[in-house]
């Protein structure tokens, strides 16, 4: 059973290595997702605010959205 905040390994060729289940899509009374359920993953962050400095390596890895939101890049 997969519940929110569970980290999962990606098994396709999308380029992602790991993702986290944020919410179970479907009926409001479902607490768990099961094997075979589809997980929607996007590269863009869910939030719109970044607090504090971030590492310079994120710019090299082309996370431009996060770099533009951060107040300082170290």
Swiss-Prot record:
Protein's GO biological process: translation
Keywords carried by this UniProt record: Chloroplast, Plastid, Ribonucleoprotein, Ribosomal protein, RNA-binding, rRNA-binding
InterPro entries, alphabetized: Ribosomal_uL14, Ribosomal_uL14_sf
Pfam families associated with the record: Ribosomal_L14
Any one Gene Ontology molecular-function term assigned to this protein's record: structural constituent of ribosome
CDD domains recorded: Ribosomal_uL14 (cd00337)
KW Ribosomal protein (keyword) present: yes
Keyword Nucleotide-binding: no
Taxonomic superkingdom: Eukaryota
Localization annotation: Plastid, Chloroplast
Subunit structure: Part of the 50S ribosomal subunit.
Similarity comment: family membership: Belongs to the universal ribosomal protein uL14 family.
Function, as annotated: Binds to 23S rRNA.
The protein's name: Large ribosomal subunit protein uL14c
Native species: Oenothera ammophila (Evening primerose)
């Amino acid at each position: 059973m997969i519940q929110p905040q569970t980290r999962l390994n990606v098994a396709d060729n999308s380029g992602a290595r790991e993702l986290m289940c944020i919410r179970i899509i479907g009926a409001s009374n479902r607490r768990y997702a099961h094997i075979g359920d589809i997980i929607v993953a996007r590269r863009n962050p869910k939030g719109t605010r970044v607090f504090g400095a971030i590492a310079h390596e994120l710019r090299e890895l082309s996370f431009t959205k996060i770099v533009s939101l951060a107040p300082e890049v170290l």
